[in-house]
Amino acid sequence: MAKFQGYLELDRFWKHDFLYPLIFREYIYAFAHDRGLNKSSLLENVGYDNKSSLLIVKRLITRMYQQNHLILVAHDSNQNNVFWSNKNLYSQLISEGFAVIVEIPFSIRLVSSLKGTEIVKYSNLRSIHSIFPFLEDKFPYLNSVSDVLIPYPIHLEILVQILRYWVKDASSLHLLRLFLHDYYNWNSLIISNKSISIFFKSNSRFFLFLYNSHVCEYESILLFIRNQSCHLRLTSSGSFFERIYFYEKIKHPIEEVFSNDFPAIPLFFQDPFMHYVRYQGKSILVSKDTPLLMNKWKYYLVHLWQCHFYVWSEPGRIHINQLSKHSLFFLGYLSSMRLNLSVVRSQMLENSFLMDNAMKKIDTLVPISPLIGSLAKMKFCNALGHPISKSTWADSSDLDIIDRFVRIWRNLFHYYSGSSKKKSLYRIKYILRVSCVKTLARKHKSTVRAFLKRLGSELLEEFFMEEEEVLSFIFPRTYYTLRRLYRGRIWYLDIFCINDFVNHE
């Protein structure tokens, strides 16, 4: 209960725009620690060594405000090296604490069972598999698709400027700006791509919030103009919490803000059949109109990024293709449009005739080559797809080794349940099964043939059981119906993030 009361106190601070005092609360870092242990975030925990105390945080903030980098260079370098050697720990402390503070309003719905607490329930966190039924319904009636890769901000100051629309606590913004600039001064005087990648990797949860704020601001403007042009509510699917902020902005008079920047919507942007779908940093624009209109949207997006967000983007980053001639790689699936040809016989009185009927249907295929590349990168096979033993797992128990391989296979099969051709997954199943046997044989210092001869080839059969067989045990009377469903596409709506082996980008 004390932990829940801490969450409620955070929520009260957020409502009154007082974020800066929360940075000096020690339980903030306890929350970050607990969340890292529970792995409630989509990202892996970067490590926590119980060194985050309130005293360290206060000393860090005080030194950030007082230090002069030009003077530090001239003073004793040995004393400064002690401080610089712990820069990763200090930056992680501040970033984790700040990430907890700004994410609490989104996690507060988890404690809605508390009495006397009025908490808004958000329903925007949808499964990413809900995107594909949308594509199945809309794609047959659309012509052009634009593959958009959202660019990253070239400077973190842009992200701080965007946060000013949400966070009105000037002290928090000042501390955030000082922290970001101070981190770069630790690396070098010139901001390089390497230092940015190091910062993003060591502070992934904190960067996720900053990047989502950038995407939210970009989508707010884009969707506002799109809705102004067609006066229809846009169907957009995603799994991250920045969409909540967008719908919160709708409740406020954002028209007054955007109308000043965009006083008139050009006529050539009026497209009632424009659809926008995004996951992480990749999005697609699909339209029924000609490629000319898509090109106008393309150059509009480039100017929006360059002029409003000061982000350099080339038109070549946005690709426009015809759905009938192009395969779209999105969320690990290779989607394409194909025609189902059928012949219908019609008879009227004494006359009969045949009619050719062509229906568009979307195909969702499994990209086997990128999957094998991911397995090779994780040392389950070589570059040609030949299974090898997982040497790093040879020290585990037999059941643990089998459980790890089975979990990977079932997660992949579960994720690609919407594929129209599941037989292509049998090669992935073969690689994982043989790699599992080779790992067990390596552990027992035996050959694969001798190991299988001693224990039997049926050792792994029950562990790699097909979902079709599992469903037949649960529903034996409807086995043939389930078999037809198995051969078709099944979109499981409990998938909220892309599989690690599927994310090849």
UniProtKB/Swiss-Prot annotation:
<comment type="function">
    <text>Usually encoded in the trnK tRNA gene intron. Probably assists in splicing its own and other chloroplast group II introns.</text>
</comment>
<dbReference type="Pfam" id="PF01824">
    <property type="entry name" value="MatK_N"/>
</dbReference>
<keyword id="KW-0507">mRNA processing</keyword>
<dbReference type="InterPro" id="IPR024942">
    <property type="entry name" value="Maturase_MatK_N"/>
</dbReference>
<dbReference type="Pfam" id="PF01348">
    <property type="entry name" value="Intron_maturas2"/>
</dbReference>
<comment type="similarity">
    <text>Belongs to the intron maturase 2 family. MatK subfamily.</text>
</comment>
<dbReference type="GO" id="GO:0006397">
    <property type="term" value="P:mRNA processing"/>
</dbReference>
<dbReference type="InterPro" id="IPR002866">
    <property type="entry name" value="Maturase_MatK"/>
</dbReference>
<keyword id="KW-0819">tRNA processing</keyword>
<dbReference type="GO" id="GO:0008033">
    <property type="term" value="P:tRNA processing"/>
</dbReference>
<dbReference type="GO" id="GO:0009507">
    <property type="term" value="C:chloroplast"/>
</dbReference>
<keyword id="KW-0694">RNA-binding</keyword>
<keyword id="KW-0934">Plastid</keyword>
<keyword id="KW-0150">Chloroplast</keyword>
<dbReference type="GO" id="GO:0008380">
    <property type="term" value="P:RNA splicing"/>
</dbReference>
<protein>
    <recommendedName>
        <fullName>Maturase K</fullName>
    </recommendedName>
</protein>
<dbReference type="InterPro" id="IPR024937">
    <property type="entry name" value="Domain_X"/>
</dbReference>
<dbReference type="GO" id="GO:0003723">
    <property type="term" value="F:RNA binding"/>
</dbReference>
